[in-house]
């Protein structure tokens, strides 16, 4: 899985940058920025990895001897380590601007190995720094940036921003039968936009969105001139994939959801976001269709969804009216999903240490 990484500037961001010569070349110049210890601890707990990236003009020359740099820098690293703050890498460019090297920020030579393949999650990784060069570095890396400022964007503000829930996923699925575009926001209650070409199916998907407390955009073009099978099946696969991606590593989620609401139908749902796909489904219908949706496709929808989402799902409904029976399943699934995806801690809810 791609990693969430924070590429953090040193002088002026982690520690105060002196205005006399812009060098921390003596131990007495070493001053941590306010709230930095607490913020980095929280960010580590939120599964961000830390990488330090710093320009140190003329390091190793007579204007900035290596030993003058090492003493305060090593003390800083010891302080961080003593507080259980660990940097995966410390990347330093020793050159001057006139050297025109490729490793000096905003150049990306120092961070290039991190950009290979899918090593980092580019949507959830950031450069944090106090200078325009840090912002340009983020742009060159194709990731986000936060400009540190002790007054307007300090470590408390950065920590709050990065740990506020904003789980999101976008999935495009194109086959010979269907073209599907799905976006899900797991922590945003807002009107959803759903268009599958099957009116009753749209209504059912809206029940999931409404009762789970998430926002969805689903746009589908399918071979409805044949029947509704491919459209419903592929929508389930795309939606399940998006939900799985949006959940990320699942740290802190409840994982389990259970609901048994009484209405004109008795519907039951038990869900476990276990990483193990399984469906047990119990429902009987009197007719082949409800509106323009085949009733046999209800089970197939939830089976495809559970396998794409990698969850264990038990569904059962009893009642007299087919419309109400089908609707009760989508509603109860949404309500159980709301419980399961809710974040209440930083702990992974598994004794195995992983929920793949």
Swiss-Prot record:
It catalyses: D-erythro-1-(imidazol-4-yl)glycerol 3-phosphate = 3-(imidazol-4-yl)-2-oxopropyl phosphate + H2O; L-histidinol phosphate + H2O = L-histidinol + phosphate. This is Histidine biosynthesis bifunctional protein HisB. The active site is at 9 (nucleophile), 11 (proton donor). It is found in: Cytoplasm. The lineage of its organism: Bacteria, Pseudomonadati, Pseudomonadota, Gammaproteobacteria, Candidatus Palibaumannia. In the N-terminal section; belongs to the histidinol-phosphatase family. In the C-terminal section; belongs to the imidazoleglycerol-phosphate dehydratase family. Keywords: Amino-acid biosynthesis, Cytoplasm, Histidine biosynthesis, Hydrolase, Lyase, Magnesium, Metal-binding, Multifunctional enzyme, Zinc. Pfam families: Hydrolase_like, IGPD. Mg(2+) binds at residues 9, 11, 130. Residues 1-166 are annotated as: Histidinol-phosphatase. Pathway: Amino-acid biosynthesis; L-histidine biosynthesis; L-histidine from 5-phospho-alpha-D-ribose 1-diphosphate: step 6/9; Amino-acid biosynthesis; L-histidine biosynthesis; L-histidine from 5-phospho-alpha-D-ribose 1-diphosphate: step 8/9. One of its GO terms (molecular function) is imidazoleglycerol-phosphate dehydratase activity. Residues 167-356 are annotated as: Imidazoleglycerol-phosphate dehydratase. InterPro entries: HAD-like_sf (IPR036412), HAD-SF_hydro_IIIA (IPR006549), HAD_sf (IPR023214), His_synth_bifunc_HisB (IPR020566), HisB_N (IPR005954), Histidinol-phos (IPR006543), IGPD_sf (IPR038494), ImidazoleglycerolP_deHydtase (IPR000807). One of its GO terms (cellular component) is cytoplasm. CDD domains: IGPD. Zn(2+) binds at residues 93, 95, 101, 103. PROSITE patterns: IGP_DEHYDRATASE_1, IGP_DEHYDRATASE_2. HAMAP family: Bifunc_HisB, HisB. Its EC number is 3.1.3.15, 4.2.1.19. Its cofactor is Mg(2+); Zn(2+). It comes from the Bacteria. It comes from Baumannia cicadellinicola subsp. Homalodisca coagulata. One of its GO terms (biological process) is L-histidine biosynthetic process.
